[in-house]
């Protein structure tokens, strides 16, 4: 959601959300859940659905563009809500118990939240890289002596992002498990794991070998760990030409471990 938004409540109505535009229906839904201050694994589906529909109607009243994606998600929320409100049939021991109807929605929200965090981190790296200023020096003479200051020198952000998306797509093609579980691997642990693997390959480690995992969330956490290492300057990426494989290299800072690492 864009900065500068505000939310007001009136009696017995859903919140009135003022903002220029959401980045998409999942952005709106995530905002409403955060506004409720509830666990993403325990979404109050009836209340959140009513609020989502209210905001979509508000967008229409303000002549804002309501894309098909918003309407599709609104319909899906209504379907999930109806499954909660309908009386549950008498349990039949011969029939396998139906799972939580919110399960797929939670999976999508978790993935969206991780992607959003990754995009924000990439933006911070791009901004910080653009704010570096240098005195006029013999650049050619110094270039061979120092690691480039920009950890993504010669690489477009889109190339790194598209490489990550390709790995996600390959993982989803073979992913069959649909259970929703909290992240088992803390980002701090994954940062150390990724850094150690890069250090073991001083001549460069392929991006596709570094960002790995059997589950989509493991791959996402690995990518977030790489972004953290790029921000800290402990690794840098290189790409010989467009559409070629991206390689990750350790920098001098890579060996600056703390006692806890």
Swiss-Prot record:
Compartments where located: Cytoplasm
Entry-linked Gene3D superfamilies: 6.10.250.2410, Structural maintenance of chromosome 1. Chain E
Assigned keywords, A-Z: Cell cycle, Cell division, Chromosome partition, Cytoplasm
Listed GO CC annotations: cytoplasm
InterPro entries (UniProt xref): ScpA (IPR003768), ScpA-like_C (IPR023093)
Biological process terms in GO annotation: cell division; chromosome segregation; DNA replication
Cystine pairs: none
Top-level lineage group: Bacteria
Self-association and partners: Component of a cohesin-like complex composed of ScpA, ScpB and the Smc homodimer, in which ScpA and ScpB bind to the head domain of Smc. The presence of the three proteins is required for the association of the complex with DNA.
Family of the protein in this entry: Belongs to the ScpA family.
Biological role: Participates in chromosomal partition during cell division. May act via the formation of a condensin-like complex containing Smc and ScpB that pull DNA away from mid-cell into both cell halves.
HAMAP family, A to Z: ScpA
Protein name: Segregation and condensation protein A
Lineage, opening ranks: Bacteria, Bacillati, Bacillota, Clostridia, Eubacteriales
């Amino acid at each position: 959601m864009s900065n500068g938004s505000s939310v007001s409540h009136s009696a017995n109505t859903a919140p009135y959300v003022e903002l220029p535009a959401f980045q998409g229906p999942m952005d709106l839904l995530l905002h409403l859940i955060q506004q409720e201050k509830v666990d993403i694994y325990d979404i109050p589906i009836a209340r959140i659905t009513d609020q989502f529909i209210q905001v979509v109607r508000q967008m229409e009243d303000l002549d804002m563009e309501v894309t098909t994606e918003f309407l599709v998600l609104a319909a899906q929320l209504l379907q999930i809500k109806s499954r909660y409100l309908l009386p549950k049939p008498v349990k039949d021991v011969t029939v396998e118990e139906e799972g939580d109807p919110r399960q797929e929605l939670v999976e999508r929200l978790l993935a969206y939240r991780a992607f959003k965090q990754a995009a924000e981190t990439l933006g911070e790296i791009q901004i910080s890289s653009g704010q570096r200023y240098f005195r006029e020096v013999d650049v050619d003479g110094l270039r061979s002596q120092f690691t480039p200051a920009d950890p993504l020198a010669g690489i477009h952000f889109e190339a790194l992002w598209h490489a990550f998306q390709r790995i996600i797509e390959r993982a989803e093609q073979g992913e069959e498990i649909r259970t929703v579980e909290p992240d088992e691997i803390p980002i701090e642990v994954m940062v150390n794991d990724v850094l150690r693997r890069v250090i073991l390959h001083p001549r460069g480690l392929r991006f596709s070998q570094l960002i790995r995992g059997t589950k989509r969330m493991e791959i996402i956490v690995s990518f977030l760990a790489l972004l953290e290492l790029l921000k800290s300057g402990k690794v840098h990426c290189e790409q010989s030409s467009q559409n070629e494989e991206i390689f990750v290299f350790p920098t001098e800072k890579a060996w600056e471990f703390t006692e806890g690492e």
